[in-house]
Structures are given as C-alpha cells and as structure tokens.
Amino acid sequence: MIETAIYGKTVDDQSRCVHWHLPKDVIAIRFKCCDKYYACFECHQELSSHPLEKYDLLDDANKHLIICGVCRHEMTFAEYYDYNSNLICPNCRSPFNPGCKLHYHLYFQNPPPAMC
C-alpha cells in the first residue's frame, strides 16, 4: 500500500512540523488548491507558489480533508470533528491537539464555531 504524502516543513514522520511540533500535533489538512495534505497552514504558505483555496465544509462534506499523521487514516471533517470531541483518532486512538479547533477558519470555509 502506498502511504499518503504529507507535505510541509516536517520534523518527523507523524506530520509534526517546525511550526507545530508538540506530541499531539499529529494531523494534516488537505488544501483544495493543490489537493495535498500539509502539516499546517504556515507550511502551505511557505512551500507552495499558488494562492490558498479552502474546502467548503458544507459543499465538500464527503471528501477526506484530515489525515492522522500516526496511522494515515483519512477522515471527512465530520468524522474528525465527531471524534475530536474525544480528541483521538478513530482508527489508532492517537490523541489530537485540542487547540486545532481555534484554527479551523484558516483551513476551511464554513467551519463550526470554536468551542472551549
């Protein structure tokens, strides 16, 4: 099986990057403009040469937009968000960073409100 690539200024093979590298920083997000997973918004901005285009969470509800950097399980936003309430990957149970919800607006159109 071919492993899905995660782009960015990564510092390990679990999607952590120079910008976000705490133990729970193990997701990457697909960008509509290039259809690639990047470790973070900053990595995309620094490494791509095209304007950012975000997926719309209403129109693209069935598209895999999030990938777990640990097991490479791809998720729709709804699947990620449902399990994110537990802050874990639904496949490998790796913990996710709860602070990611504060940045949904950087990655998606029509994001849910960030709740503390």
Curated annotation (Swiss-Prot):
Membrane topology: Peripheral membrane protein
Main location group: mitochondrion
UniProtKB keywords: Membrane, Metal-binding, Mitochondrion, Protein transport, Translocation, Transport, Zinc, Zinc-finger
Positions bound to Zn(2+) 2: 68, 71, 89, 92
Stored SUPFAM superfamilies: CHY zinc finger-like
Subcellular location(s) of the protein: Mitochondrion intermembrane space; Mitochondrion membrane
Record field: transmembrane: none
Cellular compartments per GO CC: mitochondrial intermembrane space; mitochondrial membrane
Highest taxon above the source species: Eukaryota
Gene Ontology biological process terms, A to Z: protein import into mitochondrial intermembrane space
InterPro entries (alphabetical): Mito_Tim_assembly_helper, UCP017292, Znf_CHY, Znf_CHY_sf
Binding-site list for Zn(2+) 1: 17, 19, 40, 43
Record's function text: Required for the assembly or recycling of the small Tim proteins in the mitochondrial intermembrane, thereby participating in the import and insertion of multi-pass transmembrane proteins into the mitochondrial inner membrane. Probably acts by facilitating the formation of disulfide bonds in small Tim proteins.
Protein name: Helper of Tim protein 13
Species per Swiss-Prot/TrEMBL record: Saccharomyces cerevisiae (strain ATCC 204508 / S288c)
